[in-house]
Each structure stands twice: as structure tokens, then as C-alpha cells.
Amino acid sequence: MENKFELCPKCGSKNIKWCNGKKWLCPDCGFDLYCNVAAAVGIVLYDNYDNVLFEVRAKEPRKGFLCLPGGFVDPDESAEDAVVRECREEMGAQIKEDKFLCSFPNTYVYKNIEYKTCDLFFTAKLPEEFKDMDDFVKTLRREESEVVGFEVRHISSVEEVEALPLAFTSAHKTLLRFLEVK
């Protein structure tokens, strides 16, 4: 991330500096502003037939690419609560996360600003009332501002993961980890 500030927000000095890739510091008044990592969540929702549910992104970054259901963690919200909320908002589905799978750093570029994130991924098995993922998808209501549609992909090999047009490298790494532990 480069320094986007031209003036110190506290004293107005033009001497504000970007330090060590972590914070802005004004040597004139001592103001410092840390650029902390944002927390984001995603879920690998799978069925008994090695099918995984993906969303098709409706907006940048990476509009039109596949992603795992999820999003940013809100202030004062746990990662577990965030993934349940995101599934409800984006898909109209009540999903209970099964277990924590992994986390990976990610870079999220939005409106030409680079945000560093820590993406936390969970797994959940398809709710028992559905015979398979296609049956489940028929019940979903997409959040139009976030999701163009849903895709079900068979994921049982590294080659199948490599062939996916994924929006984010953290999802790619997560699916490889999912294959290792399932």
C-alpha cells in the first residue's frame, strides 16, 4: 500500500510518512495511524458427492469470478457469527458452520485501494433435508448487489481446484487444504 495521505489529519503537516508497511506517522505532531488487517470469512459448503457451492461475484474486485460464500467481519462480530450472517444475506440460507478449516492472508483491491485481509475459512456439510447441492441451490435467494448466481462444482482433486476461475488466492489455498483434510 502506498501513502495516500498528503496531509497529517491531526496537524495538517505535509511531512506524514508511510512507515514499514504498517502505519502512517507524522514527525511534526507524533500522530500515528495503524493500517490493520481486515478480517474476512468464507465457507466451504459441501455435500456427500464432493460438490461445493460457489457464488459468482456481482461486483469488483474480480467481478464474474467464483468465490466461496462469505464477506467481511463487522465490528464487534465473531468470525463464526459473520459467516452465518453472510450466508443469510448473500444466499438467504441458514447455515451453521461446522468447523474452522484454515486462514490465509489476502489482498483485496477496491476502488484502487489495496486492503490487506486475513481470510478465515470454515466448512459446513449440506443440511440433511437436501438430497444434494443442486436441490439446495433451488432454494437460494441471491443478494443481487453481491451475487450474480450460484455454481456447484465437483471438487475431489487438485486438478479440479486448479481449473476453477477463482476470484481470490485465499480461496484456492483453502480448497487445497479442504482436499487434504476431508
Q: Whereabouts are the PLM-identified features?
A:
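Beta-strand scaffold of nucleotide-dependent catalytic cores
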Residues: 42, 53-56, 138-139
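Conserved hydrophobic "DFG−1" position in protein kinase catalytic cores
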Residues: 45-46, 54, 124, 152
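Active-site donor-binding loop signature of nucleotide-sugar glycosyltransferases
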Residues: 28, 57, 70, 152-157
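Conserved Nudix-box catalytic region and its N-terminal flanking loop in Nudix hydrolases
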Residues: 47-89
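Charged phosphate-binding loop/patch that engages nucleotide di/tri-phosphates or the phosphate backbone
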Residues: 167-182
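Acidic, metal-coordinating catalytic segment for phosphate/diphosphate chemistry
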Residues: 1-43, 48
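Unchanged
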Residues: 73-99, 104-167
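Residue-level preference for beta-strand/loop junctions
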Residues: 37, 64, 114-118
